[in-house]
Amino acid sequence: MGKRIPMFYLDPRSVSTHAMAMSNLGPSHFKGFELSNFQRKAAAALDTDHNVLVAAPTGAGKTLVAEYAIHLATSQGKRSLYTAPIKALSNQKFRDFTEDEAIPSVGLSTGDISLQSDSQVLVMTTEILRNTLIEDAESLANVGVVVFDEVHFMDDPERGSVWE
């Protein structure tokens, strides 16, 4: 039987202040931002090698948790994959990550574009990740984190099968 994957599911709407105070919280700041309780809890889970699924409203700070995971993997010498459902979002995240001085190299793979595919952080569409898993899974051996942005697309009738 396969290894059990530890996971935390964090919904900031259901995390009480008291429960957070009684549990192990991660760092209080990251990239100049003060982290909310759910972000700190997610960081603590990531610090202890747990997988994290964050469900939160727009603007609640999910991206900062994803960036924390990527920085953590980078500090451990691992690669990171950041997936997005559409090319435009992949292109935007590529630009964002290239401006992050803590990330040594950033690549992009969208089907139309393939730049530096051996980079520390590789931004790609979800279809590219699926194809890589099927055709070249060994190339993912040193991956420490995979971020699925806009995971609610799993429920999309036209695109959902890619996420499954």
Q: What are these model-predicted stretches?
A:
Residues M1-V52:
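Helicase-associated low-complexity/disordered flanking segments
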Residues G32-E164:
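Conserved P-loop/Walker A NTP-binding site and adjacent catalytic elements of P-loop NTPases
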